[in-house]
């Protein structure tokens, strides 16, 4: 009897943990199918200012500037350097002097010390507060597609659009990242069609200049891009991801580097959702409250629920034989989840196990991020993925 109670407890916690993923995936598919989110054909008439945060990017800064200069929409450029210890700034200055016609104007802001990317973005927002039009933030390791700035400009001819994010074409050999990115992108597109997504990609993110203030961002947390997207929506306009606005970047080349990146990102998203908990059930936010609430469920409650289910399952299997049909079925499901997780963990996902394994690994990263946060450690000051920079420089 006790074993059966453990089984019921495990089943209840597993349902709590997995239900939001199934519900939100179904909802997002429906929202995409029924959505009418389309990029306008007309230009907005607004100027564009590119915001480029950098730190020790000497290997790739010239390639990044060249990529931006090839855009068919001439823009202003603001580089904010987080106290680089290499020659990022000097290379930038030399390149800009060699190609003076590449941008309408340029400015390099030098921070006295490195405080993390979010602090850098906050300082840059204050510095360009006098500018009108559109701010386009992009990362040094991202290559944006031809015509990206023109497409961004067209989006803002819709007065309801406050922020637009690009969709990654992530290159690399880690199959788990490909599966994760597919799920993540479809979720963001579904949320965008329904109302807004709280999570956009900082590798290519645009917003109306007057929609975000530095005070909207919490400096001692990462996920500055998601903070901006959420702030835009809470300030009254939509934040959407465009599936045809594409940028290319490289995933970390090792599983360890990938997990480090995922845990850092997970902590930033969890902290963002917790800070905005008053909006989870806000009638004023309407549909966006539903999106925030479900993401909070998936990012905060689900990892804890699945961990609890795993503990109960372990206790049951160590203590009791499968005495009932329920216990036998749960043992099979446990084996499936364990195998799925292990296959994705070692970068060997196979059909039928890929989605489940991707979700399990995502829950693992969220749990680790929760534990790290609970210990009082912030990951907003992160170590650079030097393998990615080296690979990009050799292309």
Question: Where are the regions a protein language model picked out?
Answer:
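Short, acidic, metal-binding catalytic loop of nucleotide-sugar glycosyltransferases
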Residues: 66-75
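Short beta-strand-to-loop acidic/aromatic patch adjacent to the donor-nucleotide binding site
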Residues: 131-143
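Catalytic donor/gating beta->alpha subdomain of glycosyltransferases that bind UDP-sugars
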Residues: 156-184, 220-224, 228-292, 361-372
């Amino acid at each position: 009897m006790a074993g059966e109670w453990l089984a019921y407890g495990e089943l209840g916690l597993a349902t709590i943990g997995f239900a939001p993923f199934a519900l939100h995936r179904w909802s997002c598919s429906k929202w995409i199918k029924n959505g009418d989110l389309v990029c306008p054909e007309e230009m907005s008439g607004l100027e564009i200012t590119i915001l480029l945060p950098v730190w020790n990017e000497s290997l790739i800064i010239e390639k990044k500037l060249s990529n931006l200069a090839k855009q068919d929409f001439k823009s202003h450029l603001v580089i904010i350097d987080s106290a680089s210890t290499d020659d990022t700034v000097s290379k930038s200055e030399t390149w800009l002097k060699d190609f003076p016609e590449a941008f309408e104007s340029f400015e390099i802001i030098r921070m006295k010390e490195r405080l993390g990317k979010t602090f850098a973005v906050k300082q840059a927002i204050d510095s360009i507060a006098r500018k009108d039009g559109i701010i386009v933030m992009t990362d040094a390791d991202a290559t944006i597609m031809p015509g990206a700035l023109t497409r961004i400009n067209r989006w803002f001819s819709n007065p309801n659009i406050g922020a637009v994010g690009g969709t990654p074409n992530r290159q690399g050999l880690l199959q788990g990242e490909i599966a994760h990115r597919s799920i993540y992108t479809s979720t963001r597109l579904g949320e965008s069609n329904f109302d807004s997504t709280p999570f956009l990609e900082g590798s290519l993110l645009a917003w109306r200049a007057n929609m975000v203030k530095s005070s909207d961002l919490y400096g001692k947390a990462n996920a500055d891009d998601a903070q901006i997207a959420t702030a835009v929506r809470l300030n009254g306009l939509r934040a959407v991801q465009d599936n045809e606005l594409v940028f290319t970047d490289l995933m970390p080349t090792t599983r360890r580097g990938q997990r480090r990146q995922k845990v850092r990102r997970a902590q930033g998203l969890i902290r963002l959702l917790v800070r905005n908990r008053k909006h989870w059930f806000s009638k004023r936010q309407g549909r966006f409250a539903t999106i925030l609430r479900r993401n909070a469920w998936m990012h905060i409650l689900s990892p804890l629920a699945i961990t609890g289910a795993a503990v109960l399952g372990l206790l049951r299997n160590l203590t009791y034989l499968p005495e009932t049909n329920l216990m036998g079925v749960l043992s099979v499901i446990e084996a499936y989840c364990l195998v799925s997780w292990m296959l994705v963990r070692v970068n060997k996902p196979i059909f039928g196990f890929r989605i489940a394994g991707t979700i399990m690994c995502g829950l693992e990263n969220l749990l680790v991020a929760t534990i790290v946060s609970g210990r009082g450690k912030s990951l907003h000051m992160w170590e650079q993925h030097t393998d990615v920079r080296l690979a990009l420089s050799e292309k």
